[in-house]
Amino acid sequence: MSPTAPISRFPVPELKDLPEDIRARILAVQEKSGFVPNVFLTLAHRPDEFRAFFAYHDALMDKPSGLSKAEREMIVVATSNANQCQYCVIAHGAILRIRAKNALVADQVAVNYRKADITPRQKAMLDFAMKVSQQSYAVDDTDFAALHAHGFSDEDAWDIAGVAAFFGLSNRLANVTGMRPNPEFYAMGR
């Protein structure tokens, strides 16, 4: 990978040219993380879609839930692997390493969650997320029963499905735009 390769096949706007709310959000992320994740710059190409994307992202990923933030990131990483999304596997793999405080599990989930050192509850969660991601038309009562057997509520099932479905959108946008992972993600949480 050449460090000078473009981060997107679409135009990436200059910060100074962005609407104030988007510029403020990007600068806040930069302040917190020390860099600007390329997803922000890539999606800023379409400000209205940027706002809608991050509003839904935040509603799913930041709210109180029966799922921990690490578990939500597990869903992102496992389903992004199935969707062959390099950007999301690398970026959210980094976030998972930090949230789970376990680089080994994060890498295991990124490659094959079925062999990862995770709990049976988390495996059931990821089995459901993968079915939503790859075969949503086949989800039925037996899938909900498997979640219930591990202590998940119907609201938790909605959260699992929401994260898997949202990141299906994100994976497809990242793949189509040719979004490149920031080099900073590779070392985070290691």
Regions found by a protein language model. Name each.
Residues 1-190:
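Hydrophobic alpha-helical segments
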